[in-house]
């Protein structure tokens, strides 16, 4: 499945980002979790990631999700948003008063497909800015969303090296045939400012 095959317009994207924000807010304030919108897309299974960034300096505050379509989209958004706000091991759990100083971003993923070319050819099989990548080897794994390469202006090779580091593997791990590399695409929506207008990225 290509990203163009995920039928998500800006209206749905805005609802998805709002659901993520409301879910995190409900968890942090010990309130009832929000209802999932009725739109059919929220009841289809998709991989999804929630990214929370500080505002206005745009530093990562939490990012967790599910690369595989384990959950219906609405449920996946709620879970990933709560985990990003409270369980990202790189950060302390958010406090409720932080909600007005962060933005929420949602990435809705296609199903990952293994990159089956010769390992040395893997950079050529990855489209920077379009593909996200996953590495799996011997119980270790890591994932980088497509927008990471764009944000840090990485080449495909640099993107793969960053993936090896993210997965806790050795430098150049992507050249090793037994390291499984998969790629996926994502449709990304995010708030321009806290509680603000949502745009597609």
Curated annotation (Swiss-Prot):
Domain AMMECR1: 11-200
Highest taxon in the source lineage: Archaea
Coiled coil: none
Pfam family, one: AMMECR1
Xref: HAMAP family: AMMECR1 (MF_00645)
PANTHER family in the record: AMME SYNDROME CANDIDATE GENE 1 PROTEIN, AMMECR1 HOMOLOG
Name of the protein described by the UniProt record: Protein TV1384
Organism the protein comes from: Thermoplasma volcanium (strain ATCC 51530 / DSM 4299 / JCM 9571 / NBRC 15438 / GSS1)
